[in-house]
């Protein structure tokens, strides 16, 4: 039996949170299809949603606009629900080049991808959890609306073993091969198995740290246990186990054979069409490619690009929506769309771009027309499939405003902080005025965010402030997610005082140390200076008691006027609440941690420890060393760094390099 959702937190709902939780829960119980949680920055939206989930006790899918925010939400939910299944479902590609054809230059681009093994495991773990447990929360990106294997076929392929079962060893090995597991007697890795006499060791595709041991005696399952694949230590015996497939795209043999029959029929029709149109090159190309795929499917059960035949594999008719993560959800599931003003347009835009690329592939004989049904959901299909929904945003978009049966406001922060004071200053002196403001904030150990309209302006501004001895960094779209997280962490740690950006200083950027947000050229009406953009950007200063937003403008646009009026409305409500309850505002205190994997790291024994705790322990270890021991340790770390570099493991090499620099810079000073 599944556990109940159990929220673990040292905080109790306060401010506007109790009434918001009550209204959301009442709305869900009354059967409202759509609700909006309009929550200002720092009001505890995540905590409010966590409380609502605990009260309604329903499995939940949370959609985020990007991987960074998904990782942040995942970390927080794992802290709130340590006893429940909190899962992470994002795109597993580190690099993805879709299959495409450019007719103008007659260039065919083959699909090329690099799959992140760890994220693939987390995706499989997510679908396993939602099929086995009611107490599941999945944090996902728009990857959730892309085609996934058919849930019915996937669940039919499960391998169930119970202690005492009569089963031939060869039958188990055959079933593992059907699940696309490979035999590897030398090294036990994810989605592999090894055989040693009557013992079969299986490393499940969805497992991160545990493998399964099946002990047979005379065609009878004598023992089933979980063990540590690294140390071989037995962890626990169990009466039964279920082994899940290596991929979501596995299909029972009989369905594969019927799929091949359907592909043959479609191929024959399409070849005839191409011949009549005198497209002989396309005809020959399509026949050769499709027959090769069919041969692979017949022999191995899969082929490269098998998802292009997903219409037949999942038994759908032409034009029907593909099976997605939403199809794996139980009927009583709850959907939460975070930063909905960004996520909703994303959900609507995925289908069209995918369709245009595939139509070209079909037209020029690279794919059968049925490949068009390997696609993300259209927005109207998503709406039909979506369970009861809660939108979360500080600035809901027109869709949420139109659809919502109820808007629940979360204006008051538990810390008593009020929205930043807003000031409008002239554009003519904006750079010099900003320079004096930055120096004031830096002297108080506070940080500044500056947003510009163009890349050129951001670069020039960064250069100018650097010349005037301001510690400044520039955040732009070419910086990848990991580096972006590092820059934000360095800003919080005080490595520099000012961060310049264009459109990157908005949703979900959680930096309590920021006391000033400066918006240059605020009167240039447009996407970057719309009412929503201004409210989101100004909100970045709302986590600090000295929070202030300066808008540099020569006139007040309609967007500025509406944004300032909304901010003033919120300030009045917040001040009135503070006065009534005698609350003195105080800045949010938040430790600087790594966000992916919930600020957790594995020790060699496979147990979770806090990242900050590990760093503190390491520092204490180095401080206790003699100079000779320290020199030896540094040499060892340098060897480790070069070893990683030689193996092209550049991220690991960079991490060791940073560690060496940290020891030399900080700990040697302590020695002196």
UniProtKB/Swiss-Prot annotation:
GO terms for molecular function: ATP binding; ATP hydrolysis activity; DNA binding; excinuclease ABC activity; helicase activity. ATP binds at residues 39-46. SMART domains: DEXDc, HELICc. Residues 26-181 form the Helicase ATP-binding domain. Gene3D superfamilies: 6.10.140.240, P-loop containing nucleotide triphosphate hydrolases (3.40.50.300), UVR domain (4.10.860.10). GO terms for cellular component: cytoplasm; excinuclease repair complex. The keyword Transferase does not apply. Residues 430-592 form the Helicase C-terminal domain. InterPro entries: Helicase/UvrB_N (IPR006935), Helicase_ATP-bd (IPR014001), Helicase_C-like (IPR001650), P-loop_NTPase (IPR027417), UVR_dom (IPR001943), UVR_dom_sf (IPR036876), UvrB (IPR004807), UvrB_inter (IPR041471). Residues 631-666 form the UVR domain. Coiled coil: none annotated. CDD domains: DEXHc_UvrB, SF2_C_UvrB. Belongs to the UvrB family. HAMAP family: UvrB (MF_00204). Forms a heterotetramer with UvrA during the search for lesions. Interacts with UvrC in an incision complex. The UvrABC repair system catalyzes the recognition and processing of DNA lesions. A damage recognition complex composed of 2 UvrA and 2 UvrB subunits scans DNA for abnormalities. Upon binding of the UvrA(2)B(2) complex to a putative damaged site, the DNA wraps around one UvrB monomer. DNA wrap is dependent on ATP binding by UvrB and probably causes local melting of the DNA helix, facilitating insertion of UvrB beta-hairpin between the DNA strands. Then UvrB probes one DNA strand for the presence of a lesion. This is UvrABC system protein B.
């Amino acid at each position: 039996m599944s556990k109940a959702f159990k929220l673990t937190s040292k905080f109790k709902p306060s401010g506007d949170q109790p009434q918001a939780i009550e209204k959301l829960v009442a709305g869900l119980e009354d059967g409202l299809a759509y609700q909006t949680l309009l929550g200002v920055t720092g009001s505890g939206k995540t905590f409010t949603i966590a409380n609502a989930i605990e009260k309604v006790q329903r499995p939940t899918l949370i959609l985020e606009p990007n991987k960074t925010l998904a990782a942040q939400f995942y970390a927080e939910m794992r802290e709130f629900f340590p006893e429940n299944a909190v899962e992470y479902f994002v795109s597993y590609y580190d690099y993805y080049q879709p299959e495409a054809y450019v007719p103008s230059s007659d260039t065919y681009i083959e699909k090329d991808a690099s799959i992140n093994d760890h994220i693939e495991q987390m995706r499989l773990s997510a679908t396993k959890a939602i099929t086995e447990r009611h107490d599941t929360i999945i944090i996902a990106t728009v990857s959730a609306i892309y085609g996934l294997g058919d849930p019915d076929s996937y669940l039919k392929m499960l391998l169930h073993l119970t202690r005492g079962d009569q089963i031939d060893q060869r039958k188990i090995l055959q079933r593992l091969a059907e699940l696309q597991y490979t035999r590897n007697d030398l090294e036990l890795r994810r989605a592999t198995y090894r055989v040693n006499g009557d013992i079969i060791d299986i490393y499940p595709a969805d497992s991160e740290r545990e493998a399964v041991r099946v002990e047979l005696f005379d065609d009878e399952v004598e023992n089933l246990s979980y063990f540590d694949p690294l140390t071989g230590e037995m962890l626990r015996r169990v009466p039964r186990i279920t082994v899940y497939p290596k991929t979501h795209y596995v299909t029972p043999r009989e369905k594969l054979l019927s799929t091949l029959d359907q592909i043959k029929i479609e191929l024959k029709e399409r070849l005839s069409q191409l011949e009549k149109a005198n497209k002989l090159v396309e005809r020959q190309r399509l026949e050769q490619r499709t027959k090769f795929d069919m041969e692979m499917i017949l022999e191995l059960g899969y082929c490269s690009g098998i998802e292009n035949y997903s219409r037949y594999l999942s038994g759908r008719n032409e034009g029907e929506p593909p099976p997605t993560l939403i199809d794996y959800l139980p009927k009583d599931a709850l959907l939460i769309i975070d930063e909905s003003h960004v996520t909703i347009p994303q959900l609507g835009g995925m289908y069209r771009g995918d369709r245009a690329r595939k139509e070209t592939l079909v037209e020029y004989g690279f794919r059968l027309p049925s490949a068009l049904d390997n696609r993300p959901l259209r927005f109207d299909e998503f709406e039909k499939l979506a369970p009861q929904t809660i939108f979360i945003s500080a600035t809901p978009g027109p869709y949420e405003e139109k659809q919502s049966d109820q808007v629940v406001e979360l204006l008051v922060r538990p810390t008593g902080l009020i929205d930043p004071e807003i000031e409008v200053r002239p554009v003519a002196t904006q750079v010099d005025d900003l320079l004096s403001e930055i120096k004031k904030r830096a002297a108080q150990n506070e940080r500044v965010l500056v947003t510009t309209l163009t890349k050129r302006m951001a670069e020039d501004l960064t250069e100018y402030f650097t010349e005037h001895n301001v510690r400044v960094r520039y955040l732009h779209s070419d910086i990848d997610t990991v580096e972006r997280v590092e820059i934000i962490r360095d800003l919080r740690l005080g490595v520099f005082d000012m961060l310049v950006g264009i459109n990157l200083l908005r949703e979900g950027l959680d930096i309590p140390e920021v006391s000033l947000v400066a918006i240059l050229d605020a009167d240039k009406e447009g996407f970057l200076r719309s009412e929503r953009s201004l409210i989101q950007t100004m909100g970045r200063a709302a986590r600090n008691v000295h929070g202030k937003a300066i808008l540099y403008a020569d006139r007040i646009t309609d967007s500025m006027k509406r944004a300032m009026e909304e901010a003033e409305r919120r300030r009045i409500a917040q001040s009135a609440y503070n006065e009534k309850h005698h609350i003195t505002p105080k800045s949010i205190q938040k430790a600087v941690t790594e966000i992916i994997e919930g600020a957790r790291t594995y020790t060699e024994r496979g147990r979770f420890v806090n990242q900050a705790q590990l760093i503190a322990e390491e520092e204490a270890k180095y401080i206790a060393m003699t100079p000779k021991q320290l020199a030896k340790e540094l040499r060892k770390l340098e060897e480790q760094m070069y070893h990683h570099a030689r193996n092209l493991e550049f991220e690991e090499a960079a991490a060791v390099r940073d560690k060496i620099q940290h020891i030399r810079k900080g700990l040697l000073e302590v020695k002196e």
